[in-house]
Amino acid sequence: MNNYANYLYIAIRAAIEAGKAIMDIYTDPESDFGIERKADNSPLTKADKKANAIISMALSVTPFPVLSEEGKEIPFAERSGWDMLWIVDPLDGTKEFIKKNGEFTVNIALVKEGVPVLGVIYVPVRKELYFAADSVGAFKLAEIDNGYQPSMDEIKAKAVRLPMSMGHQGVLVVASTWAGVRLPM
């Protein structure tokens, strides 16, 4: 892998660990999710907060600032000077999380001069990890137990390069849109 390999590994581990924290709350029959409302009236749960804390801590070992959906608001004047930054949505699909329909993800991207150079999407309910890095390609790793921390060698050995051929069994399209409308799958 290229020089982003270490950052990719950090992001993968952070996403999986955040996914575990999310699932611990999601599967707790006693949990009310601690739902609050943000300034824009969108929901915020304790799972959002916990996942954000885990990811922010993991990414703090890198030299890049973190811009998170659930983090503190950072003025554009400050952000505009950043050449590289992490963009994070620790629980993308909070409304779906609350509905308990399983359609939510953990999203982490490293962006250089406005262009993503690596990204990680973890689907904790399905235990599926998608990741990509500039000059490396895109990959899928299935059956990652929430909280399990695979080595980079294990990730390389088990990951499947995307896109896969149409003949590959077990491919699932998780969502599709046409003209801004989500299509049923």
What are these regions (language model features)?
Residues 108-185:
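Acidic beta-strand-loop-alpha-helix segment within the catalytic core
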